Amino acid sequence: MNSTTCNSTLTWPASVNNFFIIYSALLLVLGLLLNSVALWVFCYRMHQWTETRIYMTNLAVADLCLLCSLPFVLYSLKYSSSDTPVCQLSQGIYLANRYMSISLVTAIAVDRYVAVRHPLRARELRSPRQAAAVCVALWVIVVTSLVVRWRLGMQEGGFCFSSQTRRNFSTTAFSLLGFYLPLAIVVFCSLQVVTVLSRRPAADVGQAEATQKATHMVWANLAVFVICFLPLHVVLTVQVSLNLNTCAARDTFSRALSITGKLSDTNCCLDAICYYYMAREFQEASKPATSSNTPHKSQDSQILSLT
């Protein structure tokens, strides 16, 4: 069947549409609120720029940018079937910050791995300046790859989601490479950290509890990463691997992409929630100011408060 005869606009039952509207509204409100508070704490309430603080500040910025672009992306998906400037700009910001978020989570996992697995070399391998350089490099790589993806997309039928009559192989390859490589790194680093922590002898009950909490946090971070992003990229992998010759098949995968894409957006809220548990200094800084004169003690979550 000719692809031009297929309806590119997804139609959902009224109840599903209402659920999506409520879901998107809650996601926007909670995500903007949580990440704005997190960014305020990182910028104004913390006393020292650690590696953790630099990575998480960039992560909060990426999540906020994605959330701000989300209403325009949803509008263009529903009401526009061509590559308008608004569509290209909003979806470009959306995609850039999705994969920037993935890249930053990967950088945090590597930083944590270095701190725990190679503590003697951590001082020369880790520093706030190096963390800032990594963030700048990641922004440049992500934005550059998005520009290349945009040019390839325009050559192959369209950059915007709604204008693509088929899934462009080269542009999808950017998405798959931008996830599966970070996934392998995050899984490796997380397993290494958990292994080291499980073998580390505890000096007392307090340290044993701290080790257990740190291990749980590593597993939780890995679970959030996999649950939010893996379903979307599995659907992309299947879609690019199959020859979708019928409108029904394309419609099915378009619905799967829509649902898994919304699932991936929840990462913006979950990232903000993880801030409160990953960094003890974030918990201290987010408390109301007191009259205590005790000096601030910086805690780096990447060492998981165990070194």
UniProtKB/Swiss-Prot annotation:
Residues 40-53, 111-129, 198-217, 279-307 are cytoplasmic. One of its GO terms (biological process) is macrophage chemotaxis. The keyword Transmembrane applies. Induction: Expression is modulated by the microbiota and induced by inflammation. Glycans are attached at N2, N7. The modification Phosphoserine is found at S286, S292, S298, S301. Predominantly expressed in immune and gastrointestinal tissues. Strongly GPR35 expressed in colonic macrophages. It is a multi-pass membrane protein. It holds the Pfam family 7tm_1. Its main location: membrane. CDD domains: 7tmA_GPR35-like. One of its GO terms (cellular component) is plasma membrane. It is found in: Cell membrane. Residues 288-307 are annotated as: Disordered. GO terms for molecular function: C-X-C chemokine receptor activity; chemokine receptor activity; G protein-coupled receptor activity. InterPro entries: GPCR_Rhodpsn, GPCR_Rhodpsn_7TM, GPR35_7tmA. Disruption phenotype: GPR35-deficient mice show compromised exercise-induced adipose tissue browning. Conditional deletion in macrophages results in increased susceptibility to DSS-induced colitis, associated with reduced TNF production. G-protein coupled receptor that binds to several ligands including the tryptophan metabolite kynurenic acid (KYNA), lysophosphatidic acid (LPA) or 5-hydroxyindoleacetic acid (5-HIAA) with high affinity, leading to rapid and transient activation of numerous intracellular signaling pathways. Plays a role in neutrophil recruitment to sites of inflammation and bacterial clearance through the major serotonin metabolite 5-HIAA that acts as a physiological ligand. Stimulates lipid metabolism, thermogenic, and anti-inflammatory gene expression in adipose tissue once activated by kynurenic acid. Belongs to the G-protein coupled receptor 1 family. PANTHER family: G-PROTEIN COUPLED RECEPTOR, G-PROTEIN COUPLED RECEPTOR 35. This is G-protein coupled receptor 35. It comes from Mus musculus (Mouse). The gene is Gpr35.
